[in-house]
């Protein structure tokens, strides 16, 4: 169903059955399949391909040559009806690729709200991107990667499958991340190593000085004290009782499957 206020260019192809919301615009030479749903106010520019069971929220901007909901590149994929779910107010720039999920994992690829996906970024199957993230030009998020809220993955960086980039963390350009990046940490290099906290990001997002000092102390316990992670865990657990941000920082020590960058 196409809402009466939607504007579909005559050179676009929108298959019967697609749900196109109010005030959506679709540019020329764009192709949208029958199982796609696009929320109100979203702008889909020219030469975009949106396929499969893809649901896109409100007020997104999708630039030319983006491909969303295409079959993933996992060799186990057998044509199952897996999905892509995208939230609201995202900017998806030229030639970004967002692949559908696999039944071996969550069967869906998820992008939250208010994200910037820069030119030619690749979002592989079963990735989960939170809110307010920045994925740089030509960055690659491998299958099953999680990028938490307010994190940044800069240009030409690659995140290994199954890794997590924690909230407010920042991965510098041209980096290769093969283990989890804890929340708030600044990472850089091939293979990426920690370079302190993302202090600029913390200040921009309203973290107060006492909270930042607590995070700095927690960082030193993990990375500079010479203690094992098992020795550090009870210290951070005690700090986390007073500082919720420290809990978020230390939670990954319990959940990581690939280990954290060191």
Swiss-Prot record:
Annotated Gene3D superfamilies: Hexapeptide repeat proteins, Udp N-acetylglucosamine O-acyltransferase, C-terminal domain
InterPro entries in the record: Acetyltransf_C, Acetyltransf_C_sf, Hexapep, Lipid_A_LpxA, Trimer_LpxA-like_sf
Molecular function as annotated in GO: acyl-[acyl-carrier-protein]-UDP-N-acetylglucosamine O-acyltransferase activity
Entry EC number(s): 2.3.1.129
Catalytic activity: a (3R)-hydroxyacyl-[ACP] + UDP-N-acetyl-alpha-D-glucosamine = a UDP-3-O-[(3R)-3-hydroxyacyl]-N-acetyl-alpha-D-glucosamine + holo-[ACP]
UniProt cross-references to Pfam families, sorted A to Z: Acetyltransf_11 (PF13720), Hexapep (PF00132)
GO biological processes: lipid A biosynthetic process
Top-rank taxon: Bacteria
Pathway(s) per entry: Glycolipid biosynthesis; lipid IV(A) biosynthesis; lipid IV(A) from (3R)-3-hydroxytetradecanoyl-[acyl-carrier-protein] and UDP-N-acetyl-alpha-D-glucosamine: step 1/6
Keyword RNA-binding: no
Enzyme category, top tier: transferase
Complex and partners: Homotrimer.
The family this protein is said to belong to: Belongs to the transferase hexapeptide repeat family. LpxA subfamily.
Function: Involved in the biosynthesis of lipid A, a phosphorylated glycolipid that anchors the lipopolysaccharide to the outer membrane of the cell.
PANTHER family, per the entry: ACYL-[ACYL-CARRIER-PROTEIN]--UDP-N-ACETYLGLUCOSAMINE O-ACYLTRANSFERASE, ACYL-[ACYL-CARRIER-PROTEIN]--UDP-N-ACETYLGLUCOSAMINE O-ACYLTRANSFERASE, MITOCHONDRIAL-RELATED
Protein name in UniProt: Acyl-[acyl-carrier-protein]--UDP-N-acetylglucosamine O-acyltransferase
